[in-house]
Amino acid sequence: MAPGRAVAGLLLLAATSLGHPSEGPELAFSEDVLSVFGANRSLSAAQLGRLLERLGAASQQGALDLGQLHFNQCLSAEDIFSLHGFSNVTQITSSNFSAICPAILQQLNFHPCEDLRKHNAKPSLSEVWGYGFLSVTIINLASLLGLILTPLIKKSYFPKILTYFVGLAIGTLFSNAIFQLIPEAFGFNPKIDNYVEKAVAVFGGFYMLFFVERTLKMLLKTYGQNDHTHFRNDDFGSKEKTHQPKTLPLPAVNGVTCYANPAVTEPNGHIHFDTVSVVSLQDGKTEPSSCTCLKGPKLSEIGTIAWMITLCDALHNFIDGLAIGASCTLSLLQGLSTSIAILCEEFPHELGDFVILLNAGMSTRQALLFNFLSACSCYVGLAFGILVGNNFAPNIIFALAGGMFLYISLADMFPEMNDMLREKVTGRQTDFTFFMIQNAGMLTGFTAILLITLYAGDIELQ
């Protein structure tokens, strides 16, 4: 440490002896110094020697146990003036110089500003690209889950698994928006601005209404008298239903629902789809499309819905990559939080896309290829996000991603989570089981993002 700094520390210590503060912030700063270096609010010669070691006037030995301090944050000159009741235009003279000496001495000894700079240090460019590329690669592997999990779709327990992951996606997306992205867009710091409690209240308001609404529906609903039709394997054997064929709904994604007419039923109850009707929820129009799912048709024979889904999904993944890239430039932990939210959302999203592409006329290989190609646009978004985050203020990207996460979680996935139960709930016990699974998924996602936000300063990715 420079000798000039040691001399400054000694001068400050001498200056404090000129005044005898009995109250106010100067007493708190003095107690911080005396509690660490002295005993019983006094300083012996040996203890003064340790203080001199800390200031660099003597060789330093051992580490300090700071304990509980009154002020353990970085204070600017304006902050020190304000704490002592001085305005920014006040001129410090010998009569009031001793009042601010303990504050300056405390800042010199404990270096809170250096800790703040270390905490706010941005990751290196290689770390940003490395962790960003790894995160996007893991997320893109979710596009392959459609092929792996297709055999499980017909299992009785699969709706419960999918319900949990949809709830998990809602919890992580919503929490990431209110805890990370939107506050970052406004320039808030969770350690300084103390917005976390208010963000928890926002989630609490949403969850409370969800819990009350679902509970009332379970208590007041009369099961077995639904206004929609359940399809069983024996339904397709009656003549009446042969003349009036029903339609079987497929998963709804991006505002589009596919309905397949059951033409041939195998003895085990599995249905071959010879035609698919694509119904857009926006205009209500229906387009027939030939479907031969297990062969490789020409691209011109594939339904328009497949290309619309592929393009929309590519744009969606581009924005996801943009958010990950901008988050990684800010901090690796912020990038991890955003990546977790996107990963949880991609699992049910990509699975639904895969099923729709199959029923639009693509073969399994074609659906897998185009689903993966649309997922690769996330790399392009990652590159743009890193470039913007390193050269410009990324706040606008965080605001855009925060709004997108809120829309996907509340306007897209939340209704889907409720609609997917219509054909599965047969009684109050089943309804309660799915309700608990929904709660488990949402609360798991909420807790994960909350813990990352609260302990962001204590977690280091190296």
Swiss-Prot record:
Q: Which residues lie on this side of the membrane: Cytoplasmic?
A: 154-160, 213-367, 412-431
Query: Span of the secretion signal?
Result: 1-19
Q: Which UniProt keywords apply?
A: Cell membrane, Glycoprotein, Ion transport, Lysosome, Membrane, Signal, Symport, Transmembrane, Transmembrane helix, Transport, Zinc, Zinc transport
As for membrane topology, the entry says: Multi-pass membrane protein
Q: Which Pfam families match?
A: Zip
Give TM regions.
133-153, 161-181, 192-212, 368-388, 391-411, 432-452
- Briefly describe its induction: Up-regulated in monocytes upon adhesion and recruitment to arteries. Up-regulated by the pro-inflammatory cytokine interleukin-1 beta/IL1B.
Topology Extracellular: residue spans:
20-132, 182-191, 389-390, 453-462
Protein modification? N-glycosylated. N-glycosylation is not required for proper iron and zinc transport.
Q: Name one GO cellular component term.
A: plasma membrane
The glycosylation sites annotated in the UniProt record are N40, N88, N96
Q: What is its main location?
A: membrane
UniProt GO molecular function: monoatomic cation:bicarbonate symporter activity; zinc:bicarbonate symporter activity
How does activity shift as pH rises or falls?
Optimum pH is 7.5.
Q: What does this protein do?
A: Electroneutral divalent metal cation:bicarbonate symporter of the plasma membrane mediating the cellular uptake of zinc and manganese, two divalent metal cations important for development, tissue homeostasis and immunity. Transports an electroneutral complex composed of a divalent metal cation and two bicarbonate anions or alternatively a bicarbonate and a selenite anion. Thereby, it also contributes to the cellular uptake of selenium, an essential trace metal and micronutrient. Also imports cadmium a non-essential metal which is cytotoxic and carcinogenic.
Protein name per Swiss-Prot or TrEMBL: Metal cation symporter ZIP8
**What gene, per UniProt, encodes this protein?**
Slc39a8
